Amino acid sequence: MAIVTMKQLLEAGVHFGHQTRRWNPKMAPYIFTDRNGIYIIDLQKTVRKIEEAYNFIKQIVAEGQTVLFVGTKKQAQLTVVEEAGRCGMFYVNQRWLGGMLTNFQTIRRRIDRLKELEKMEAEGRFEVLPKKEVAELMHEKQRLEKYLKGIKDMTKLPGALFVIDPRKERIAVAEARKLGIPIVAIVDTNCDPDEIDYIIPGNDDAIRAVRLLTSRMADAVLEGRQGEQLAPEPDQEAVVEAEA
């Protein structure tokens, strides 16, 4: 069975690129035509590229590696939480903090601090502290949680990144490239495909398009796990936060 059909791609608007004045010439091989000043992406090529990306993700997960889902733009935030949660992988859906990959040990220390604050709260230790100090600790906890919740249990670097809009996530892309971590990405007509190992030519702005393509990569993770029942329910708190 096909991973995705042309009909599904069309219905989700995956074929709509950016305005013709906002494009990267390196994306020319993936453009079918232009219509009313908008580039139309060649979905036959998109289907093939989805299959390549799907098989790659399935393979690395089958080998025991993880995938980090990255999408901080508003159109992607909710989908990233839901789909990463569905397949039991890690995610970043708020601002990418510089060094999340290249300075991972420092990031781990911040995660340890978050876990320490969570433990203090759970044990009721906040109740014996002055109100001002509790307010400061809660503010610190909420800030750490906002940015690090999706990678809280990530103990080592991921085997790959799945990125929605590599232009927006250029710092994440640069860090992954520096470390030799393969990148799978939804690449619109204004992006540089040369920076990406497995490109999925497609609309990175429409919520339905982002959801369809991201869900297929989550499916690849689940297939790589061969049905292993490890996927938690989507993080409802993060879902609410993404909707806010």
UniProtKB/Swiss-Prot annotation:
A molecular function (GO) term: structural constituent of ribosome
Coiled coil spans: none
NCBIfam families registered for this protein in UniProt: rpsB_bact
InterPro entries associated with the record: Ribosomal_uS2, Ribosomal_uS2_bac/mit/plastid, Ribosomal_uS2_CS, Ribosomal_uS2_flav_dom_sf
Family designation: Belongs to the universal ribosomal protein uS2 family.
Gene Ontology CC, one term: cytosolic small ribosomal subunit
One GO biological process term: translation
Swiss-Prot/TrEMBL keywords: Ribonucleoprotein, Ribosomal protein
Gene this protein is translated from: rpsB
Protein's recorded name: Small ribosomal subunit protein uS2
Claim: Iron is one of the keywords in the record: no
